[in-house]
Regions:
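Non-catalytic, surface beta->alpha helical segment in thiol-disulfide oxidoreductase systems
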Residues: 57-73
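Small/polar loops that bind or transfer phosphate-bearing groups
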Residues: 7, 33, 61
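A short, hydrophobic beta-strand/beta-hairpin element that forms part of a small beta-sheet core
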Residues: 50-58
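Alpha-helix C-terminal capping segments
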Residues: 21-27, 52, 69-73
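Local sequence-structure signature of Cys/Sec-based thiol-disulfide redox active-site neighborhoods
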Residues: 1-25, 29
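Thiol/disulfide oxidoreductase modules built on the thioredoxin-like
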Residues: 43-48
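Thiol-based oxidoreductase modules, predominantly thioredoxin-like and allied folds used
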Residues: 29-39
Length: 73
């Protein structure tokens, strides 16, 4: 299975639907990263979250559906 990472932060209104889409495809087999705990991540991702990486490559930004993620995987 591919390594899926979701970058998110508290108060992000687009993050919950993105996490739900990833969970629908991956179950609990993905990494959820709260960027608010790391200054560098905050700087890199704050204006782009949620960001979903698949095997280290940024594949989605802002929105995705479970079907779109399935197509990538």
């Amino acid at each position: 299975m591919a390594r899926v990472v979701v970058y998110t932060a508290p108060g992000c209104h687009l993050c919950a639907p993105a996490v739900e889409a990833v969970r629908a495809v991956c179950g609990d087999a993905f990494v959820l990263v709260d960027i608010s705990t790391d200054r560098e991540l905050e700087r890199a991702y704050r204006r782009r979250i949620p960001v979903v990486e698949v095997d280290g490559i940024e594949r989605f930004r802002y929105e995705l559906t479970a079907d779109e993620l399935r197509d990538i995987l």
